[in-house]
């Protein structure tokens, strides 16, 4: 009951009784009241240190055979479980902004349409937990030995996997919408009361409760083969082969799945009031590389090092050389220089994973003080399957001057 201005904020009638805080609002226009909103301190609900369980296993073994071949084995596994991690009872209804609540709907006591800005559950309700689990596993074994020429060889295989699972509680947009319309709950006849939270049953609260359940798996397998030694001409060298396979998978529950258009825009939101969700994906790639490096002391003063790497990627190939020289001009001065090219592939996440992040926006007054509270918005972060590797050319010239045993100056 009462008379209110257009755009005037009206707080929950039981705000203070349910441990809420009255927050005066700025006037929407000269001569109009901004009203008051009901907020609450949710920061003290979070843990500075969560209750966690940690476990780890490490095994290592080395042995030598009669033929001079050595065998190495390493295994490591870790598991971290976050057991509690309490959150806010619910989050701001970002997916429900701008929807008018008609008179008599969802317990509205007003005789005209209003806009509801709030959370499904406020300060009077307990905090749901957001458990996390992070597991890492790595196994590696290899052989090494010496050839008849005196050069050494080694081969290693490494397989690793990281699995990250979490659940972040939220509210279902579709079920919350149905409950507000009076067709919620298991029976399809229950109504959510936006204006008296104590009128909502535990069963109806469970009905609208949802969340983002996500599992991310990153795995990598690498096979390395290397030969090192010195030629008859006094050239130190290393050459080898590397084969690599990596994968990146993201699994989501249905509520947290979003759909993106070709331009990266969100064409279908997740079924969550606050969290934006994202895409599921399952992607992998292979690469094979060969490389060689050689070093030669051309004279007592000049050392030359050259290297090259050719790598065949899933969709393209790259060749990257490197050459460097070091010249001892005299006992006090060394000159050096190098030239190389390099590249870096985009990650599988950049190539195939799209998600909706949350960004907090804060407005400020002319004097720099905060104006109002932080507002959250959803921001689409889209993948780009056409990303190309970064490439670079690197040139360096330098000198090392050592005038005495106590002083050394390097310039590059």
Model-identified regions with their sequence ranges:
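Outer-membrane beta-barrel channels and translocator barrels
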Residues: 52, 64-68, 148-150, 232-234, ...
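Solvent-exposed loop/turn segments connecting transmembrane beta-strands
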Residues: 51, 218, 284, 310-320, ...
């Amino acid at each position: 009951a009462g008379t209110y201005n257009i755009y005037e904020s009206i707080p929950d009638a039981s705000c203070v009784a349910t441990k809420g805080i009255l927050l005066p609002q700025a006037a929407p226009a000269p001569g109009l009241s901004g009203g008051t909103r009901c907020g609450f301190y949710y920061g003290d609900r979070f843990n500075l240190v969560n209750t966690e369980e940690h476990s780890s296993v490490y095994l290592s073994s080395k042995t030598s055979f009669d033929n001079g071949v050595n065998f190495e084995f390493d295994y490591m596994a870790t598991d971290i479980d976050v057991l509690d991690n309490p959150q806010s009872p619910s989050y701001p209804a970002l997916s429900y902004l701008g929807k008018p609540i008609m008179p008599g709907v969802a317990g509205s006591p007003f005789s005209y349409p209003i806009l509801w800005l709030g959370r499904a559950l406020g300060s009077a309700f307990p905090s749901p937990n957001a458990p996390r689990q992070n597991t890492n596993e790595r196994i590696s074994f290899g052989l090494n030995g010496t050839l008849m020429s005196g050069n050494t060889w080694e081969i290693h295989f490494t397989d690793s996997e990281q699995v990250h699972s979490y659940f972040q509680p939220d509210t279902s947009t579709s079920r919350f919408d149905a409950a507000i319309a009076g067709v919620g709950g298991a029976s399809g006849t229950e109504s959510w009361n936006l204006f008296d939270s104590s009128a909502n049953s535990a069963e109806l609260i469970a009905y609208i409760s949802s969340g983002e359940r996500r599992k991310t798996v990153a795995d990598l397998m690498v096979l390395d083969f290397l030969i090192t030694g010195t030629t008859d001409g006094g050239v130190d060298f290393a050459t080898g082969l590397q084969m690599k396979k990596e994968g990146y998978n993201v699994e989501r529950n249905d509520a947290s799945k979003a759909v993106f258009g070709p331009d990266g825009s969100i064409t279908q939101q997740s079924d969550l009031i606050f969290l934006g969700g994202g895409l599921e994906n399952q992607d992998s790639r292979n690469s094979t590389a060969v490389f060689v490096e050689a070093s030669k002391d051309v004279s007592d003063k000049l050392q030359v090092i050259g290297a090259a790497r050719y790598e065949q990627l899933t969709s393209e190939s790259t060749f990257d050389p490197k050459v460097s020289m070091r010249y001892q001009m005299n006992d006090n001065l060394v000159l050096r220089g190098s030239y190389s090219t390099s590249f870096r592939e985009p990650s599988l996440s950049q190539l195939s994973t799209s998600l909706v992040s949350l960004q907090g926006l804060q407005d400020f007054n002319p004097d720099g003080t905060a104006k109002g509270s932080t507002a959250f918005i959803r921001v689409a972060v889209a993948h780009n399957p056409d990303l190309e590797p970064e490439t670079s050319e690197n040139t360096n010239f330098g000198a090392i001057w050592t005038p005495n045993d106590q002083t050394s100056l390097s310039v590059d």
